[in-house]
Amino acid sequence: KAQEPWFGIEQEYTLLNSVTKWPLGWPKGGYPAGQGPYYCSVGAGRSIGRDIPEVHYRCCLHAGIQISGVNGEVLPSQWEYQVGPVEGIAMGDQMWMSRYLMYRVAELFNVEVTFDPKPIPGDWNGSGGHVNFSNRQPESPPAGKQSRSSAKKLGKRHRWHIAAYGEGNERRLTGKHETSSMNDFSWGVANRGCSIRVGRMVPVEKCGYYEDRRPSSNLDPYVVTRLLVETTLL
């Protein structure tokens, strides 16, 4: 507890047509134009189902969940919301409640939600549950050295973490579509293709966070946050 572990989780998900079980707004039995124009987009045909994440955002605020943002993702009809920063085990509490609210909101629109890490096979992005992590250490080394030390510890237990980071994650962690390969461990500054991404300003400001990009969208937040603390702080 003295370390004050703080977490922020980026929860990605995909909206599905409740009848066809195909992504919302996609041609029946077909595909939309390729990825590129959908990420953080605006406009009909690009930003699909926006009402759902916006209503969900407001529900989370009313429920006391520390939701901190929403954005459209790379796959059309894929969205993300962020919860945090939250300290310790409360991260798991808030993430599970936010998921419940997402299901309830989507129900009102007669839309289904999937947290599958690779809802559409092929040349399409999967869905992750990236975990941002930081902690307070009064006598800690500079953040750059601390990040390197944590990365080395995480690298030694890479397979252990991968086994607990979500069901079906092997379909997502291929080394393509802004992921690292699940068979290799890597870290870097502002690099989305790494297992661990260190914030761009960490080397400059000598403080900050790092992002574990390996967890899938169906991660158990209690398990993942516990593993990060066990591996890097205990």
Curated annotation (Swiss-Prot):
GO molecular function: ATP binding; glutamine synthetase activity
Compartment(s): Cytoplasm
GO CC terms: cytoplasm
Alphabetized Gene3D superfamilies for the sequence: Glutamine synthetase/guanido kinase, catalytic domain (3.30.590.10)
Region (Disordered): 126-157
EC number: 6.3.1.2
GO biological process: glutamine biosynthetic process
Reactions it catalyzes: L-glutamate + NH4(+) + ATP = L-glutamine + ADP + phosphate + H(+)
Quaternary organization: Homooctamer.
PANTHER family: GLUTAMINE SYNTHETASE, GLUTAMINE SYNTHETASE CYTOSOLIC ISOZYME 1-1
The protein's name in its UniProt record: Glutamine synthetase
Originating organism: Dunaliella salina
